[in-house]
UniProtKB/Swiss-Prot annotation:
PsaA and PsaB bind P700, the primary electron donor of photosystem I (PSI), as well as the electron acceptors A0, A1 and FX. PSI is a plastocyanin/cytochrome c6-ferredoxin oxidoreductase, converting photonic excitation into a charge separation, which transfers an electron from the donor P700 chlorophyll pair to the spectroscopically characterized acceptors A0, A1, FX, FA and FB in turn. Oxidized P700 is reduced on the lumenal side of the thylakoid membrane by plastocyanin or cytochrome c6. Its main location: plastid. P700 is a chlorophyll a/chlorophyll a' dimer, A0 is one or more chlorophyll a, A1 is one or both phylloquinones and FX is a shared 4Fe-4S iron-sulfur center. Chlorophyll a B1 binds at residue 654. The gene is psaB. The PsaA/B heterodimer binds the P700 chlorophyll special pair and subsequent electron acceptors. PSI consists of a core antenna complex that captures photons, and an electron transfer chain that converts photonic excitation into a charge separation. The eukaryotic PSI reaction center is composed of at least 11 subunits. PANTHER family: OUTER MEMBRANE PROTEIN, OMPA-RELATED, PHOTOSYSTEM I P700 CHLOROPHYLL A APOPROTEIN A1-RELATED. This is Photosystem I P700 chlorophyll a apoprotein A2. GO terms for biological process: photosynthesis. Coiled coil: none annotated.
Length: 734
C-alpha cells in the first residue's frame, strides 16, 4: 500500500529519488496507468470530475459578474458605451506611486482599475442586463450552480450513485440526450431569453423577476403560433434609425430574417439571432429523436457504420469495427471532441469580428483584437491535443484484428502516401511563399519596389463577389444587380446583407490584395507543416521501418540507444512536442495578419498594410517594431503611463519564453552534473546543511525537460503577444 505521494502508484511511491515527485505529477491524470484502476471506475472518475470542471467555470464566471458589479462601472458604461472604458476590477497594489494611481484611475472612477478587454460588458448589455443588481443576481445564481455541481460530483463518487459501465457506453441514448437536451433545449432556452428579456430591453423595456410574467414579448401573444400565422412574428421589425436600448423607432417583431447589422450598434439584429437559435433548437430536438433506444424505432449506430462499405468492394470494409473501437477508446472520443472544439473556437474567433453579435463591440478595437487572438490560440492548443490523443489511441487502444481492412487499418497501410503528400504540399508552399517574399525584400532593399512580384487573389475576390461584394467588378451572382439571386435577396431573404457586405464600417468581407495573398499562403504553409508533423506522429505511433515495435515503448520514450540506428525524437510525444512549435508559429502568423490589417483599417490607413505586407522587412519594421514602441515606452526615466503594466508583462513574458531554451537546448547530463555540484555545496554549507531531504535529487528525463522547455516557450510566447496586441491597440485607440 502506497503511503507517500503518489498514492496511485506503488512503484513510484517507493522510488528513493526525486523522480517520485516529478513522475507522480506527470502521471496524476493518466488514470489508465494507476494501480487497481478498472475500466468502470476509470469512467466513473472522469464523469465525476466533469462536475468539478463545471463548478470551476461557474465560480470563475460568477467572479467576473461580482467584481464588475462591485468595482466596475457597468451602469455608467451603459449610458455611453462608445466613450466610457469598461472596468474589469479595482487594483490594490502597494507598489503604486502617485503617478500610477493617477494613470490607472480610468473609466470615470477615482481609484486604479483594470480595463475589461473581454467583451463581457457588451454581452451583458446585449442580453438585457441594465443594473449592477442584475450582475449581483447573476453572480449569486452561478455560485449556487457551482455548489450544486460540486455536490453532484461528490454524489456520483458514492457507490449508490456511480453509473455503470453500460450506461457510459449507451451511445444512442447519450447522443439523443445530448442532441435534444444539451444543444436543442439549451438553444430553445436561449431563444426564449432573447425574446422575453433581451429584445424588450433593446427597445427600452427592462425585464426583471418583478415584471417577467406580466410583460408579453409580442402584442399578439401565442395566437400566431397556434393559428399557424408564424410570419406575424416577423412583421414590423426595428427601424434602421432605432436607438438601441430605447423605444425610439423600435418595432414589434421578435423573429426576423433581416441580415446585416443594426446601423447604430453595428451588431447583428437581436431578432435575427433569436430566429437563428429557434431554428437550431428545432433541428437538434428532431435530431435527438433519431437513434434507437426504448421503442425499437430509429437508427442503430452500429448498423449505420457496418453498412458504410465502398460499393465496389475494392476499398476495404469501410466503417466495420469502428463502433466497438470508438466505444471502447476514451482517447479516440477525446480526440474527436478536441478536434470539434478546436474548429468551433477558431470559428468563434472568425465570427466575433466579422459578424459581431454584441452591441457596440465592433467599436471596441482592443476587445476585438484580444478576443480574436484568444480564441485562435485556444483553437491551436485544442487541435494539437486532438492529434496527441489520436496518437495515444493508436498506441494503447487500437486493435489490428478488430479493425482488419477498415478505414483505420487502410489509413495505416498507406501512411507513406499520406505523409509524403503532406510533405510535398508543405515544401511547395514553403519554397514558393518564401521565394516570393524574399524576392520582394531584395528588390525593395535595392530601391526597385516596382519590381516586386504582386499577385492579386482573383479566386478569393471572385468568391467574395459571388457573396455580393461589388468592389472588384466581377458581375456574378450577388455582385450582379440583374441576377435572380440578387432579386431574391431583396424580397425573400436577408434584405440588409448586400448593404452590409459593401459597407466599410464593418469587417464582414475585407478588401484583399497581394499582401493578403502572400500571408494566406504563409498561414497555409504553417497549417500543412503542423498537420504533417502531427499526422506523421500518429500514423507512426505504433511502429515504423526504423522501429517496428515502437508501440511497446508507449506514447513517450526518450531514446532507444544507438543500436537501433538512433531512435531519439521518434516517439508520438516528440511529434506533439514539435507540432506545438509549428502550431504557435502558424497562430502567430494568423494573429499578426489579422491585427495589422485591422489596426490600419481602424486608423483609416489601409494602404500601410497593402504596401508593406508584401515583403518580410515590412512585417518586421512596420508591424512588429513600429507597434512595439508604446510598450517599450510604457515606463522610462521620465515616468510611466497606463500601458506600463503591459510593458512590464511584455518584458517578463520574453524572459519566460527565453528560459524555455535553457531546458530545450541542454539535456539530462548537464543537469545531473549541476545537481550533483549543488548537492555537494549544500551539504558543506553551514546552516543550509541543517536542511536535508529523503529523496535523492536526480535530473529530469529528456522528455520531462523538453516538456518544461515547451511550457516555458509556449506560455512566454503567448503572453508576449498578448501584451503586445493589447498595448499596441490600446495605445492607439484608448
Amino acid at each position: 500500500m502506497a503511503t507517500k505521494f503518489p498514492k496511485f502508484s506503488q512503484s513510484l511511491s517507493s522510488d528513493p529519488t526525486t523522480r517520485r515527485i516529478w513522475y507522480g505529477i506527470a502521471t496524476s491524470h493518466d488514470f489508465e496507468a494507476h494501480d487497481n484502476v478498472t475500466e468502470e471506475n476509470l469512467y466513473q472518475k472522469i464523469f465525476a470530475s466533469h462536475f468539478g470542471h463545471l463548478a470551476i467555470i461557474f465560480l470563475w464566471t460568477s467572479g467576473n459578474l461580482f467584481h464588475v458589479a462591485w468595482q466596475g462601472n457597468f451602469e455608467a458604461w451603459i449610458a455611453n458605451p462608445l466613450k466610457v472604458k469598461p472596468v474589469a476590477h479595482a487594483i490594490w497594489d502597494p507598489h503604486f506611486g502617485q503617478a500610477a494611481l493617477k494613470a490607472f484611475s480610468r473609466g470615470g472612477v477615482n481609484y486604479p482599475v483594470d480595463i475589461s478587454y473581454s467583451g463581457v460588458y457588451h454581452w451583458w448589455y446585449t442580453i438585457g442586463m441594465r443594473t449592477s443588481s442584475d450582475l449581483y443576481a447573476g453572480a449569486l445564481f452561478l455560485l449556487v450552480l457551482a455548489a450544486l455541481c460540486m455536490f453532484a460530483g461528490r454524489l456520483h463518487l458514492q457507490p449508490k450513485f456511480k453509473p455503470s459501465i453500460s450506461w457510459f457506453k449507451n451511445n444512442e441514448s447519450r447522443l439523443n440526450h445530448h442532441l435534444s437536451g444539451l444543444f436543442g433545449l439549451s438553444s430553445l432556452a436561449w431563444c426564449g431569453h432573447l425574446i422575453h428579456v433581451a429584445i424588450p430591453a433593446s427597445r427600452g423595456q427592462h425585464i426583471g423577476w418583478n415584471n417577467f410574467l406580466t410583460t408579453p414579448p409580442h402584442p399578439a401573444g401565442l395566437k400566431p403560433f397556434f393559428t399557424g400565422n408564424w410570419s406575424d412574428y416577423s412583421l414590423n421589425p426595428d427601424d434602421p434609425s432605432h436607438i438601441f436600448g430605447t423605444s425610439s423607432n423600435s418595432g414589434k417583431a421578435i423573429l426576423t430574417f433581416l441580415g446585416g447589422f443594426h446601423p447604430q450598434t453595428q451588431s447583428l439584429w437581436l431578432t435575427d439571432i433569436a430566429h437563428h437559435h429557434l431554428a437550431i433548437a428545432v433541428i437538434f430536438i428532431i435530431a435527438g429523436h433519431m437513434y434507437r433506444t426504448n421503442f425499437g424505432i430509429g437508427h442503430n449506430i452500429k448498423d449505420i457504420l457496418e453498412a458504410h462499405k465502398p460499393p465496389s468492394g475494392k476499398m476495404g470494409l469501410g466503417h466495420k469495427g469502428l463502433f466497438n473501437t470508438i466505444s471502447n477508446s476514451l482517447h479516440f472520443q477525446l480526440g474527436l471532441a478536441l478536434a470539434c472544439l478546436g474548429v468551433l473556437s477558431s470559428l468563434t474567433a472568425q465570427h466575433l469580428y466579422s459578424i459581431p453579435p454584441y452591441a457596440f463591440i465592433s467599436r471596441d478595437f482592443v476587445t476585438q483584437a484580444a478576443l480574436y487572438t484568444h480564441h485562435q490560440y485556444i483553437a491551436g492548443f485544442l487541435m494539437v491535443g486532438a492529434f496527441a490523443h489520436g496518437a495515444i489511441f493508436f498506441v494503447r487502444d487500437y486493435d489490428p484484428k478488430q479493425n482488419k481492412d477498415n478505414v483505420l487499418y487502410r489509413m495505416l497501410e498507406h501512411k507513406e502516401a499520406i505523409i509524403s503528400h503532406l510533405s510535398w504540399v508543405s515544401l511547395f508552399l514553403g519554397f514558393h511563399t518564401l521565394g516570393l517574399y524574399v524576392h520582394n525584400d531584395v528588390v525593395v532593399a535595392f530601391g526597385n519596389p516596382e519590381k516586386q512580384i504582386l499577385i492579386e487573389p482573383i479566386f478569393a475576390q471572385w468568391i467574395q463577389a459571388t457573396s455580393g461584394k461589388t468592389l472588384y467588378g466581377f458581375n456574378v451572382l450577388l455582385a450582379s444587380s440583374s441576377s435572380s439571386a440578387t432579386q431574391a435577396a431583396q424580397s425573400l431573404w436577408l434584405p440588409n446583407w448586400l448593404e452590409a457586405i459593401n459597407n466599410n464600417n464593418n469587417s464582414l468581407f475585407l478588401t484583399i490584395g497581394p499582401g493578403d495573398f502572400l500571408v494566406h499562403h504563409a498561414i497555409a504553409l504553417g497549417l500543412h507543416t503542423t498537420t504533417l508533423i502531427l499526422v506523421k506522429g500518429a500514423l507512426d505511433a505504433r511502429g515504423s521501418k526504423l522501429m517496428p515495435d515502437k508501440k511497446d515503448f508507449g506514447y513517450s520514450f526518450p531514446c532507444d540507444g544507438p543500436g537501433r540506428g538512433g531512435t531519439c525524437d521518434i516517439s508520438a510525444w516528440d511529434a506533439f512536442y514539435l507540432g506545438v512549435f509549428w502550431m504557435l508559429n502558424t497562430i502567430g502568423w494568423t494573429t499578426f495578419y489579422w491585427h495589422w490589417k485591422h489596426i490600419t483599417i481602424w486608423q483609416g490607413n489601409a494602404s500601410q498594410f497593402n504596401e508593406s505586407s508584401t515583403y518580410l522587412m515590412g512585417w518586421f519594421r512596420d508591424y512588429l517594431w513600429l507597434n512595439s514602441s508604446p510598450i517599450i515606452n510604457g515606463y522610462n526615466p521620465y515616468g510611466m503611463n497606463n500601458l506600463s503594466v503591459w510593458a512590464w508583462m511584455f518584458l517578463f513574458a520574453h524572459l519566460v519564453w527565453a528560459t524555455g531554451f535553457m531546458f530545450l537546448i541542454s539535456w539530462r547530463g548537464y543537469w545531473q552534473e549541476l545537481i550533483e555540484s549543488l548537492v555537494w555545496a549544500h551539504e558543506r554549507t553551514p546552516l543550509a546543511n541543517l536542511i536535508t531531504w529523503k529523496d535523492k535529487p536526480v535530473a529530469l528525463s529528456i522528455v520531462q525537460a523538453r516538456l518544461v522547455g515547451l511550457v516555458h516557450f509556449s506560455v512566454g510566447y503567448v503572453l508576449t503577444y498578448a501584451a503586445f496586441v493589447i498595448a499596441s491597440t490600446a495605445g492607439k485607440f484608448n
